Amino acid sequence: MKVAVSGFKGRMGHEVVKTILREEDLELVAVLDHEPKEKNIREIVEFSSLDVPVYGDLSEMLEEIKPDCVVDFTIPKVGYSNTKTILEHSVRAVVGTTGFTPEQISELKSIAESKKIGALIAPNFAVGAVLMMQFAQKAAKYFPNVEIIELHHDNKLDAPSGTAVKTAEMMAETREFVKQGAADEVELIEGARGGEYEGMRIHSVRLPGLVAHQEVIFGAEGQGLTIRHDSYDRISFMSGVALSVRKTKELETLIYGLENILD
């Protein structure tokens, strides 16, 4: 399968490149970066033995290289437009960029179905994180009092994380609506109680040294339950990325969430 990587100079994109190179059934055919200085990836010392073109224009790459799939790990402000461009060129997409609205996901799904091509957008590609979300969804049925704390490196641009939003969406499907906190509570500092989604509070932490972490804290009379997942290294996401690339061959629609392709 011929794979191109968009955002290859980012931390996740860099790890994706190394993963594609390790997989025998996947071939790295192009990489993309915003205003690249290089014309070929071999100009980067780490990849000096390779011969893979570097592009700065997504449409140009799609038309010249015609990859089977593009893996996109860029930034929220271009994630939607990149994915739309990829799908409109009838190319499969695996997207780890976050910040999509429900309306954007719906539109992209319609494009994928009209082209009969597979695509996947996932807030998190770590299998452990997917299990964490599923466990939280099940627990929310019995513990409606819940708050989410997500912790990431301080270069992350969006808050809350896509994983936190997806977790809240999944819990809302099983959870009785409860507006978390006292009815007359007052924030002495604006934002102290975090963001709100369907009555649940979501808190975002950004610190150097972190990668990606989340805990879902449930409370009830006389007891508490905490479900936590930690990614200490970006390698934790790569098995999910490789699985998703292969899975797009079997799909004729866009799937949102890695949990929807796991057996």
Curated annotation (Swiss-Prot):
Report which reactions are catalysed by this protein.
(S)-2,3,4,5-tetrahydrodipicolinate + NAD(+) + H2O = (2S,4S)-4-hydroxy-2,3,4,5-tetrahydrodipicolinate + NADH + H(+); (S)-2,3,4,5-tetrahydrodipicolinate + NADP(+) + H2O = (2S,4S)-4-hydroxy-2,3,4,5-tetrahydrodipicolinate + NADPH + H(+)
Q: Does the keyword NAD apply?
A: yes
Q: What is its EC number?
A: 1.17.1.8
> What CDD domains would the database entry show?
DHDPR_N
Query: What GO biological process terms are annotated to this protein in UniProt?
Result: diaminopimelate biosynthetic process; lysine biosynthetic process via diaminopimelate
Keyword tags: Amino-acid biosynthesis, Cytoplasm, Diaminopimelate biosynthesis, Lysine biosynthesis, NAD, NADP, Oxidoreductase
Which biological pathway?
Amino-acid biosynthesis; L-lysine biosynthesis via DAP pathway; (S)-tetrahydrodipicolinate from L-aspartate: step 4/4
Secretion signal: which residues? none
For this record, the Gene Ontology CC terms, alphabetical, are:
cytosol
**Keyword hit for NAD:** yes
What stretch or stretches form a coiled coil here?
none
Kindly give the InterPro entries that the UniProt entry links to this protein.
DapB_C, DapB_N, DapB_N_CS, DHDPR_bac, NAD(P)-bd_dom_sf
Its localization reads: Cytoplasm
Say what the protein does: Catalyzes the conversion of 4-hydroxy-tetrahydrodipicolinate (HTPA) to tetrahydrodipicolinate.
Q: What is this protein called?
A: 4-hydroxy-tetrahydrodipicolinate reductase
Species of origin reads Listeria innocua serovar 6a (strain ATCC BAA-680 / CLIP 11262)
